Amino acid sequence: MGQQVLKFSNEKMEKAVAAYSRELATVRAGRASASVLDKVQVDYYGAPTPVVQLANITVPEARLLVIQPYDKTSIGDIEKAILKADLGLNPSNDGTVIRIAFPALTEERRRDLVKVVKKYAEEAKVAVRNVRRDGNDDLKKLEKAGEITEDDLRGYTEDIQKETDKYIAKVDEIAKNKEKEIMEV
């Protein structure tokens, strides 16, 4: 039973780190990336629809994103949704495609983005620690029920702590790399 708790905790910690990585992909680091539009929802025939389902998104140059809607009538709605998402981007619409030029990041904007990265990192660490707490609680319940011994409890608790430390170090490393990428001029 204790092994199952360890395995389950490990899987949940892995998912927390993966979610953090996906979240960081939406933080732009001066280069154009289609992932900045992942959370943009377009009001398409009354239903909120992700922009990636309505258009082909390409990156022809390092600082340019081109959005080519499958349905030309939705081009205005896509442009409005991008502006409403408040990503600091200014789309330009020529009737067939939307172009988004990514401006070079200012020093102040870079520092703001680093703060966002640190905030996301802290949220990911909290998620990992919550998994640790839940795992430890489950182990204590097993020990109270007599399914594992006190020594097993101590051993499994140490194992969960080692996993927690490993995943928190992974979050720190990902954050450090993203900060370095953002601060690159």
UniProtKB/Swiss-Prot annotation:
Domain of life of the source: Bacteria
Keyword Transport assigned: no
Family membership: Belongs to the RRF family.
Signal peptide annotation: none
Top-level taxonomy: Bacteria, Bacillati, Bacillota, Bacilli, Bacillales
Name this protein carries in UniProt: Ribosome-recycling factor
Function in brief: Responsible for the release of ribosomes from messenger RNA at the termination of protein biosynthesis. May increase the efficiency of translation by recycling ribosomes from one round of translation to another.
GO CC, one annotated term: cytoplasm
Native species: Bacillus anthracis
Keywords: Cytoplasm, Protein biosynthesis
Location, primary (coarse class): cytoplasm
